[in-house]
C-alpha cells in the first residue's frame, strides 16, 4: 500500500469498498481468505487483491504490486521490478540482490534486511526512515478500514484529511476498541 500511495501521490481515499469471504478453509477463523478492495481517490484507484489460499500467480509473482499508468506498467515485488510500455515491451528490469519466494509472508530477503537495518539505524543514529511513521500509519489505517468495509458489507466514505468514516456511526464504532480492565494502554 505504501508504494501504491507513493506512486500515485495520495493519502487517505475518499471511498473504500471490499468484497470477499472465507472460501478456502472451513474453520473458525473470523476473517476472509479472499478479498478484493477498491480504494477510490479523486483521480486514482488502488485495487488490492488478497487471495492467500490459492496457488495462481499473476505476472509470475505470488505477491507484489502492479501500477498501471498512462505511459506503461510497473511490476514490483521483493524480487525486483519490471517496467513495460503501453505495447507490453519490457523497458527496464532490476533484480534484487537476494530475493525470496513471494508466495507467503515468511520470506526474508534483501528488502526485509534493508527495512530492519534502516529502522535500527534510525534508532541508533537518527537516520531518516525510508517510510516515515506518519506515512506508514496512513497505509495501515487505510488497510484496516478495508476490513471494516468488508465486515459491514458496504462502501465507506472517508474524511480524506484524517481517514475517519463519515456518516456511518455503526462502522465508526470499529475505529477504536474497548480494552479489558488492566490492559488499557498508558501513554
Outline where the language-model segments fall:
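Contiguous beta-strand/loop segments that form the cofactor/metal-binding neighborhood of enzyme cores
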Residues: 1-134, 140-187
Amino acid at each position: 500500500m505504501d508504494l501504491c500511495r507513493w506512486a500515485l501521490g495520495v493519502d487517505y481515499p475518499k471511498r473504500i469498498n471490499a468484497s470477499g469471504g472465507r472460501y478456502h478453509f472451513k474453520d473458525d477463523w473470523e476473517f476472509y481468505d479472499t478479498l478484493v478492495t477498491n480504494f477510490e481517490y479523486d483521480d486514482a484507484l488502488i485495487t488490492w487483491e488478497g487471495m492467500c489460499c490459492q496457488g495462481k500467480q499473476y505476472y509470475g509473482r505470488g505477491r507484489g504490486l502492479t501500477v498501471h499508468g498512462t505511459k506503461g506498467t510497473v511490476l514490483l515485488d521483493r524480487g525486483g521490478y519490471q517496467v513495460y510500455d503501453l505495447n507490453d515491451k519490457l523497458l527496464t528490469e532490476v533484480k534484487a540482490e537476494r530475493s525470496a519466494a513471494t508466495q507467503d509472508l515468511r520470506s526474508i530477503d534483501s528488502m526485509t534486511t534493508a527495512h530492519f537495518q534502516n529502522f535500527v539505524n534510525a534508532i541508533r543514529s537518527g537516520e531518516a526512515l525510508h517510510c516515515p511513521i506518519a506515512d506508514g500509519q496512513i497505509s495501515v489505517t487505510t488497510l484496516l478500514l478495508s476490513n471494516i468495509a468488508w465486515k459491514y458489507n458496504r462502501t465507506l466514505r472517508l474524511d480524506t484529511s484524517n481517514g475517519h468514516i463519515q456518516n456511518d456511526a455503526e462502522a465508526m464504532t470499529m475505529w477504536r476498541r474497548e480494552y479489558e480492565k488492566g490492559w488499557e494502554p498508558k501513554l
